[in-house]
A protein has these predicted regions:
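N-terminal helix-turn-helix DNA-binding core of bacterial DNA-binding proteins
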Residues: 7-48, 54, 67
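Short, intrinsically disordered or compositionally biased N-terminal tails of bacterial proteins
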Residues: 1-6
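Short E/K-rich amphipathic alpha-helical oligomerization segments
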Residues: 63-69
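Basic, amphipathic "hinge/linker" alpha-helix immediately C-terminal to the N-terminal HTH DNA-binding motif
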Residues: 70, 74-92
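Glycine-centered, phosphate/nucleic-acid-interacting loop/turn motifs that mediate DNA/RNA or nucleotide
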Residues: 60
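Amphipathic alpha-helical dimerization/coiled-coil segments
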Residues: 86-120
Length: 120
């Protein structure tokens, strides 16, 4: 596996978490999600986002409503369900545990590469 494939796999693993976090702030239009992800340097295309949103809705974690737009057709705005909020809280706890574990491993590896000793 080359680095590009590894990066894609890592991003796929956190994309659902990021999407739920963005939606947790309130009603969000899909285009705004794409903009926020892009500004965070997470490149996602509509062909990836919309199937993910459908899967999250089918899981019961989000819902949507149609809102009339003065500049075109109605827009679909996404919002977390109560079940989605609970799921996001659990994902966030898992994220912090995982990030802490990864940081511990990286820190130990750096210590060892500098000639230090590993503390288990």
């Amino acid at each position: 596996m080359n680095i590009e494939n590894a990066q894609v796999q890592m991003r796929k693993g956190i994309l659902e978490f990021c999407i739920l976090h963005i939606i947790s702030r309130g009603e969000v239009y899909a285009s705004d999600m794409l903009d926020e992800l892009t500004s965070a340097r997470i490149m996602v295309v509509e062909g990836t986002l919309y199937p993910l949103l459908t899967r999250l809705k089918n899981s019961g974690w989000l819902d949507y409503k149609w809102v009339e737009s003065s500049s075109g057709p109605p827009r679909k705005y996404y919002v977390l369900t109560d079940e989605g909020k609970i799921f996001l809280e659990a994902m966030q706890a898992t994220w912090f545990e995982l990030a802490d574990s990864v940081q511990t491993i990286i820190h130990r590896s750096e210590e060892l590469s500098r000639g230090g000793t590993s503390k288990s």
